[in-house]
Amino acid sequence: MAEITASMVKELRELTGLGMMECKKALSEAGGDMKAAEDLLRIRSGAKASKAAARIAAEGVISGFITVDGKQGALIEVNCETDFVAKNEDFINFAGDLAKLMVSQSVSDTALLAEMPLAGGETVESVRKALIMKLGENISIRRGISYHAEGRLAMYLHGSRIGVMVDYSGGDEALGKDIAMHIAASKPVCVSSAQVPVDLLEHERQIFTAQAAESGKPANIIEKMVEGRVTKYLAEVTLLGQPFVKDPEQTVEKLLKTKSAEVSNFTLYVVGEGIERKSDDFAAEVMAQVSQSK
């Protein structure tokens, strides 16, 4: 059996909001598999899927660029090791220059950027290495995407840690900005229920079925419970199904219809999203927090 460490219990508690002993027991039953343990706890507690915020550990910036005509744009994430470097002007400018380069070269594969020249003539890789020497931290170009809009593009950057690019048609620039801001706040998975990944939906359906079975109700009632939860889940994770953040009385879908507008696609980047937190000594962390509170 895999060893269940304090840091594993801590991470599961952060993901689920449940008690230490419940988390430790679930990890033991799941053989140390974090995802399986989370699913076990969801079945028992009826909880929703976690936002996995506890796993976001990297520093860096999200930068973006859109051409004046709104037809081309790019979004990029560049990582560093500390918040201090993430606020450095040279680092921020480097990320901005990369976004512009992606647009001018129509590049989405960031691996192709390395040997491309920036405005000053130096290659991306040589500038990156020079920044590493100057700032004393590893700097990596994590991901990026370039757009050729079907309609036109809107972008929203929340500080430099969250970035959204939306391809939409109809409405005006203010609507595009509002939709991008909504996506940053509500973090939908996709535009419509038809775009929800099949494996993700099936996984949630299995969880809902197991949760409903815990009620001990007849099969026909369980089936209705599951379908109700699936419908609610689809509304929560799709852009069109979500209540609009600036007016929760209407959904985004209703807002778009009143403006004769449509959203064809969007990209949402959050700095460090999906990067696993480094294992820390849980006891040492607790002691550090106690010392700081004195």
From Swiss-Prot:
The gene is tsf. GO terms for molecular function: translation elongation factor activity. This is Elongation factor Ts. HAMAP family: EF_Ts. It comes from the Bacteria. Gene3D superfamilies: 1.10.286.20, DNA helicase RuvA subunit, C-terminal domain, Elongation factor Ts, dimerisation domain. GO terms for cellular component: cytoplasm. Residues 82-85 are annotated as: Involved in Mg(2+) ion dislocation from EF-Tu. It comes from Nitrosomonas eutropha (strain DSM 101675 / C91 / Nm57). The lineage of its organism: Bacteria, Pseudomonadati, Pseudomonadota, Betaproteobacteria, Nitrosomonadales. Keywords: Cytoplasm, Elongation factor, Protein biosynthesis. Belongs to the EF-Ts family. It is found in: Cytoplasm. Associates with the EF-Tu.GDP complex and induces the exchange of GDP to GTP. It remains bound to the aminoacyl-tRNA.EF-Tu.GTP complex up to the GTP hydrolysis stage on the ribosome.
